[in-house]
């Protein structure tokens, strides 16, 4: 029987890895046939690799790496110190690598909430990387722009009474955006990426990553179709948080494409 086409790290859609990863030699190291050799010991202060395995998706097979970053632990807000890199292809030493830094959104990504575009942005990023056969999604566990799930749902309740996403946070005494990108910068450094093509609509994210030493060769828009529930939220991000997106008052957005 002919084996399935594609191997881990290639954007072949239905391709599967030829062999699952196995432990060899020193148990402190994980070895994969794709030649991704990842130590479980500390990479830099506060950052550790905990696990690695190929994960088949409808967009191709990604290598999933689980990083533990102690500096992001906020148990009072329910934030996790464990972050994920989904890697397709050999990105080490590469320039202009398509990359999305994506923050966790339980409400949309698990339960299908229509109040934001997070789920669609994540899906679009994976699809684009799959088409290119090379790229990275960094999934940061900082729910609700870093305020945690409980505070996010409290903000949702205020939004139900007519407050936008910014005012809801402020009424609760919370910052507009509490996210930090130190884990993302550390993961990019560990993966050996020279420079990135960042998928984002958020200029503040660009500035924050550059301040942490990440080389951003270009920025590409991450715009997906809106809906009547997400349009007010996205409009608030455009008008009050400086996101580079078209006006969505009509409830419609554009397809993912390169920014100027």
What are these regions (language model features)?
Residues 14-15, 234:
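General helical secondary-structure elements
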Residues 18-19:
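Basic polycationic patches enriched in arginine
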Residues 10-12, 31-32:
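Low-complexity, intrinsically disordered or signal/transmembrane-proximal segments
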Residues 29-260:
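Catalytic domains of riboflavin
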